[in-house]
A protein has these predicted regions:
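N-terminal beta-strand motif that seeds the catalytic metal site of vicinal oxygen chelate
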Residues: 1-16, 69, 126-128
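Short beta->alpha transition motifs characteristic of CBS
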Residues: 5, 104, 111, 123-128
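Core segments of cupin and vicinal oxygen chelate
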Residues: 8-52
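Vicinal oxygen chelate
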Residues: 9-14, 70-115
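Conserved catalytic-core motifs of GNAT/GCN5-like acyltransferases
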Residues: 29-33, 98-100, 123-128
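Long, continuous compositionally biased terminal/linker segments
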Residues: 40-81
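Short glycine-/small-residue motifs
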Residues: 66, 121-122
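Conserved Rossmann-like nucleotide-cofactor binding loop
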Residues: 118
Length: 128
């Protein structure tokens, strides 16, 4: 349904570093970066796979309140690795890796708050 999403961040360099480290276990890379010189105002970093940016961060005034994004993980080990990497990168725990049977029997997710307080999740829907 969605092609890509983007959010403004309060500290572009800090957030770019956070997402680079947090996304590595999920196989997501920085696939495109656009400088403020190119846009005439804000820097943007696009993360995704196979050269296709699907999640963007941009320098600017953060939105009021937080948002929640769930990123697909290939397996439960990747969810665990995302959680550890995101915490090491400066994220804050918002729910450790584990089953969330109130969603469905195989819902395995982990939640971390990014540097701006957004709820970032890695999720796997496959059985163990």
């Amino acid at each position: 349904m969605l092609d890509h999403v983007g959010i403004p961040v309060s500290d572009y360099t800090r957030s770019k570093g956070f997402y680079l480290r947090a996304f590595a276990p999920l196989g997501y890379d920085l696939v495109l970066e656009v400088s403020s010189k190119e846009t005439g105002g804000h820097s943007h970093a696009g993360f995704g796979t196979k050269g296709r940016p699907q999640f963007w961060i941009g320098s600017g005034k953060p939105i009021i309140g937080s948002v929640h994004f769930a990123f697909m993980a290939k397996d439960r080990t990747a969810v665990d690795a995302f959680y550890a990497a995101a915490l090491k990168a400066g994220g804050k725990d918002n729910g450790p890796p584990g089953l969330r049977p109130h969603y469905h029997a195989n819902y395995y997710g982990a939640f971390v708050l990014d540097p701006d307080g957004h709820n970032i999740e890695a999720v796997c829907h496959l059985p163990a």
